[in-house]
Design a protein with these regions (language model features):
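Short hydrophobic beta-strand motif reused across regulatory alpha/beta modules
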Residues: 17, 29-37
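Conserved beta-strand core positions
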Residues: 17-19, 95
Length: 144
């Protein structure tokens, strides 16, 4: 039995659109399509789960699941999903966090307060935070 991530790696390595399923005795049982694998991986990463996504970029030595989780949980949310990958161009770790609520203003502010660079996010921000940000941009512009 292969995990869907292993099957996806095989499909990618050999550029397959269909992966045959065989028993040890080479008896053909059926096939799995790449689309089937994408749907399975989508379930694993919670594509359809409600909530916001926050993407951080950091040095690998600064990554601490417990610290990131503590920051999220201290803002009345929970980590529903956390994935990481190494970005060779920037030589930094990209951390994608899915949380169980859409409003992210307090969590974004907390990450910034603890000096975790927020690369981007998909969620809702309170109107007052947008207003404050626009005001700060205007003041910076007027000071130029």
């Amino acid at each position: 039995h292969l995990h869907c991530l292993e099957a996806m790696q095989i499909a990618n390595d050999f550029r397959l659109s269909l992966i045959p399923i065989v028993e040890k005795e080479a008896v053909y049982l059926g096939a799995v399509t790449v689309n089937d694998l994408l749907q399975a991986i989508g379930k694993i990463v919670g594509v359809r789960d409600a909530g916001a996504v926050i993407v951080l970029e950091m040095e690998q030595r600064n990554f601490s699941f417990s610290e990131l989780s503590r920051i999220v949980e201290s803002n009345d949310a929970q980590v529903a999903q956390l994935n990481t990958y190494w970005e060779p161009q920037s030589e930094r770790l990209i951390v994608t966090i899915k949380i169980n609520k859409f409003e992210v203003s307090d969590i974004i502010n907390a990450f910034q307060r603890y000096e975790y660079p927020v690369k981007y996010y998909f969620g809702e921000e309170l109107y007052e935070n947008e207003l404050r940000s626009n005001y700060e941009h205007l003041m910076n512009y007027l000071n130029i």
